[in-house]
Amino acid sequence: MKLVIKVTGKFFDDQGDKTPLSSAIRSLVQEGHRVALVTGGGTTARKYISLGRSLNLNEASLDLLGIWVARLNAFLMALSMPDLAYSRIPESLEQFLEYWGHGKVVVVGGFQPGQSTAAVSALVAEAISADYLVMVTTVEGVFDSDPKKNPNAKFLPRVTTTELKSILENTQSVKAGTYELLDPMAMKIVERSRIKVIVTSVDKIGKLTRIIKGEETASIVEPV
């Protein structure tokens, strides 16, 4: 299968061991999958965006700051897999497709201002006709409300994009560093190309192969 793995930037926020991610990618490749990895910017990106705001930078410039941090995280992961990953980080979809043609794992940060890394991951999934877009987040899947605010939030093993849009309504923002699980642009891409999305937690990175096989709990978002 062709897989796009989007990992929240919060995975890179602490100094903890990052080998579970590279090990999971390695396992997927060994099982015969083609893999693209997309990394977010996390707290470091938001820190630079905040510094940029203090200097009165515009939203496009703030986006660029976040993109460069996401690319740094991508470069870190590419360096950690020298035998598997293409050594350069693409800065556009055209570059991504060029690197993808070499047959290796391609690791991506951001492309251009106005796009979240969620949108980038959806674009990449669309461009390679991915079987799944796997969103690795800070929660174990999709809930009917924010589980961090509502302890009684209900876990949803299957949800449509229409239902997910309703859940996320009024929580989206287009400002740099404030994107949600799937922002409007990412949602449109998922719907127009009917990309199946799996949502899981960073705590389960080591179980990605089982998640892909449906042997581990995760949420599946069906495009409609």
UniProtKB/Swiss-Prot annotation:
Q: Where does UMP bind?
A: 41, 63, 111-117
Give Gene Ontology CC terms.
cytoplasm
Involved pathway(s): Pyrimidine metabolism; CTP biosynthesis via de novo pathway; UDP from UMP (UMPK route): step 1/1
A Pfam cross-reference name: AA_kinase
* Subcellular location per the Swiss-Prot or TrEMBL entry: Cytoplasm
The record lists its disulfide bonds as none
Q: How is its activity regulated?
A: Inhibited by UTP.
Q: What is its EC number?
A: 2.7.4.22
- Catalytic reaction(s) noted: UMP + ATP = UDP + ADP
The alphabetized list of GO BP terms reads: 'de novo' CTP biosynthetic process; UDP biosynthetic process
One GO molecular-function entry = UMP kinase activity
| Residues that coordinate or bind ATP | 6-10, 42, 46, 137, 143, 146
Q: Which HAMAP family match?
A: PyrH_A (MF_01220_A)
General function of this protein: Catalyzes the reversible phosphorylation of UMP to UDP.
Record-stated family: Belongs to the UMP kinase family.
| Listed name of the protein | Uridylate kinase
